[in-house]
Amino acid sequence: IRIMKNRLFLSVLLVAFVAFGQNPIEINYVKNQDNSVSFYYKKIVPGSYLVQVYFEELTNTRAANSETKVIRNSSGQLLTLKPERAENQIGFRFSYRYFKGDFNSKVRSNFPYILPFKKGKKVIPKELYSIENIHFNSELPKNWKAYSFDFTKEQMVKAIRKGVVVEIVNHYTADTLRKIDYYSKNNSITIEHKDGTVASYQGFDKNKIKVKLGEIVYPQSELGGLAKYDSRSLYRLYLTVFYYETVQGKSLQKIK
């Protein structure tokens, strides 16, 4: 079953990831015997990250003042500075920052996704619109799609595609004593796919999430049970599939 005939992707503006506690990414360097300098990274969180390294006071090298790379593994080599004069060392100072996501990846726009429920179950997806479109009558963002699914009984949500769990939010409890139109925050599971697309599933009971951070899931893998939405007999899933990209015409190097 194809859940999406159109491209269900949300073009997300570049937003810096703010780390709390231990840094999810660390970069160190080694000075080699040939006077080159190799930079290595360690990543303690799952998923892809875009890393930007900035250099100041570069001497004895023709290297650029900044380097940008998407990293996916837990560790590896990031880049190497080579000396212009092999007999002398390279002088430098460096800093770095990182952003969550596989930016400007080669997305498979015609990939067939399956429904996020038990095989053979009949469901009616409701297409969602942006706030700007609803309240300001503006045009829909290009390549933007999201859906909700409503049920009168609890449902088990399943993965629509193979991927790795990159984020789990399980802090919230629904208000079941009154009717609620909309929650600004929901318990959610975020899964990154091989081509850089990301699926966000929202609406879980915080005690019924079945996956762990970093776990690989497959189509029809159980993710978790939906929470009762409010005082009604209503269980609702919000599903969004998107990818990360920079603003058209704006270089990563110019984003501060």
Where are these regions (language model features)?
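Bacterial Sec-dependent N-terminal signal peptides
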Residues: 1-26, 41
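Cationic-aromatic interfacial patches
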Residues: 22-75
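Short alpha-helix capping/helix-loop boundary micro-motifs
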Residues: 63-64, 149-152, 203-211
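Surface-exposed, glycine-biased beta-strand/turn segments
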Residues: 70-185
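Acidic, glycine-rich catalytic/binding loops that coordinate metals and/or anionic ligands
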Residues: 113, 209-218, 222-256
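A short acidic/small-residue loop/turn micro-motif
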Residues: 173-174, 206-207, 231
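Active-site region of chymotrypsin-like
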Residues: 188-213
